[in-house]
């Protein structure tokens, strides 16, 4: 019964295996968002015996908002294609502000007890006569005085330092390009409770979400709990943020080009994160175009530099 719910089947279809092929990113996301919206509309008309009528009605009430989201994302990308950068940012920031109530968030310290890993190509071992503190800083984000070394990556534009960390050393190595010679460090984000860094969480995948929803609803119904609305809203939020999460997760077709169009939308999202006081970064799954990272439970986090100290490092991250 559970696996036959039409909404379940549609969501499992959208498993973040996102590759634009010969289409440009604007065309690809326009087709992908439109198909997602149409599939959700069809799904609410089908058999959803497990989720039930209450959830279906909740989702129906949000279909207009979902349609807007699916239309606005390609509009933003098209503005960027036309070189209208100011309009791109304005429309993007408006969308992200509008989406704030739907975003999942997670504190940084909740991952592996706050332990993360960073790898950089080269030898950063501390040798005799070297300043250990200065050497360790070289494994942190690039200082503001060395902005000329900052390239463009998924969540960062050239010249704007961003700290990328992984919850697993192996994933950090893959993300670094699998260098033969490298140094790594383990970092502890030792904040707790409500003091942790707040991350917008794009790491959820449909099989994980639906598995959790199934367990929660079965337990709630067996115990005659009245809080099933909480679980319905959790699933609703997943559906509503999927188009944005997808736009930030398209696999790169060619990393050797000077301009990577798959990075346009996630870079825009991170610029919004940089300017808001409510969030500190993004938690996300790897989008490397390789089966070596498929199925890994590890995640990445990206933390933009917001406020510099005198030594060129971020005031809160350092």
Give the predicted meaning of each segment:
Residues 150-151, 157, 169-170:
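DNA-binding interface regions
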Residues 160-165:
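A short, exposed loop/beta-hairpin motif centered on an aromatic-Gly-Thr core
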Residues 169-179:
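Short active-site loop/helix that positions an aromatic residue
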